[in-house]
């Protein structure tokens, strides 16, 4: 049986700010449990709803050298929807009313998280064949695996996959600050490794040292090899083109089933879609103060208002 660990800064239903949480919450439960043991590890934020905290059970704790101090690392565990979830607990780093805060503080706390994930694994009775890292917040996991965790039988042979959900956000900080907190040596701060300009770059570290790289579509995989879309990392993307794959995010057919979805006005299915779905169109027209017209073309987009999401293309087509 193959063992896979998803490492992420967010995951539904526990904590969500964007689409990353949907992917990390939905994909693990889609693996065939006869062949794959897929688990997820993420921070235990104080801003998580109490109902999720109440499900967590103490697993273990230890102290870890980090940024010149001995830091507490607690590990909690729960099983939800057939998937085992681990939560890294540290009130110093994960207390607050939202998961992401001030930029420099986020850099430090996710460096802590990445090191804590690897430090905790030998105590969890779970040795993954693959660690699947998501976005810049987990970018140092592949780096640490090649550095301070490279020795010993436990970590030998563990592979990493780095998935880019949004290349724009990379986890940059000044090189000296980056070195001091991460504990990484000067060796890693060259332009072919973690350095970009005057900064250390967490995402770049993951992209350099991961065994494979994925992103959210074949089109995006090609786009990020270009200077226009590459966010300063297009050269690295071209260099790693043989290891880069685009995989389109799927749909959760349980949560987004219109026949059972309690969040729509009228539920429908394959047999009655033409009769029933129109009621939802009328409802949103009424809610938005629009003319209720069954023949009026409507486009609905669940998205952030950013140029990355293609709103310029919609405006162009409308014109």
What are these regions (language model features)?
Residues 1-319:
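Catalytic cores of nucleotide-sugar-dependent glycosyltransferases that transfer UDP/GDP/TDP-activated
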């Amino acid at each position: 049986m193959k063992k896979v660990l998803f490492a992420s800064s967010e995951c539904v239903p526990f904590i969500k700010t964007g689409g990353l949480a949907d992917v990390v919450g939905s994909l693990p439960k889609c693996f065939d449990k006869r062949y794959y043991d897929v688990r997820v590890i993420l921070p235990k934020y104080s801003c998580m709803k109490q109902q999720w905290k109440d499900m967590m059970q103490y697993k273990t704790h230890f102290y870890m050298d980090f940024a010149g101090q001995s830091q507490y690392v607690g590990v909690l565990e729960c099983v939800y929807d057939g998937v085992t979830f681990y939560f890294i607990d540290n009130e110093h780093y994960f207390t607050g009313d939202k998961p992401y805060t001030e930029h420099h503080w986020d850099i430090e706390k996710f460096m802590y998280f990445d090191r804590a994930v690897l430090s905790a694994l030998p105590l969890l009775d779970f040795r993954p064949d693959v660690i699947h890292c998501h976005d810049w917040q987990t970018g140092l996991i592949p780096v640490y695996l090649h550095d301070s965790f490279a020795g010993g039988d436990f970590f030998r042979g563990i592979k990493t996959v780095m998935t880019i959900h949004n290349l724009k956000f990379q986890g940059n900080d000044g090189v000296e600050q980056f070195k001091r907190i991460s504990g990484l040596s000067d060796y890693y701060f060259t332009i072919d490794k973690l350095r970009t300009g005057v900064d250390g770059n967490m995402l770049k570290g993951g992209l350099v040292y991961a065994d494979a790289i994925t992103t959210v579509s074949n089109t995006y995989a090609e786009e990020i090899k270009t200077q226009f879309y590459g966010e300063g990392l297009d050269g690295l993307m071209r260099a790693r083109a043989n290891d880069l794959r685009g995989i389109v995010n799927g749909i959760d057919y349980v949560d987004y089933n219109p026949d059972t979805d309690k969040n729509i006005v009228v539920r429908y299915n394959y047999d009655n879609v033409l009769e029933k779905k129109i009621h939802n169109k009328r409802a949103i027209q009424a809610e938005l103060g629009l003319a209720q017209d069954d023949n009026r073309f409507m486009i609905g987009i669940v998205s952030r208002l950013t140029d990355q999401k293609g709103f310029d293309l919609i405006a162009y087509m409308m014109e």
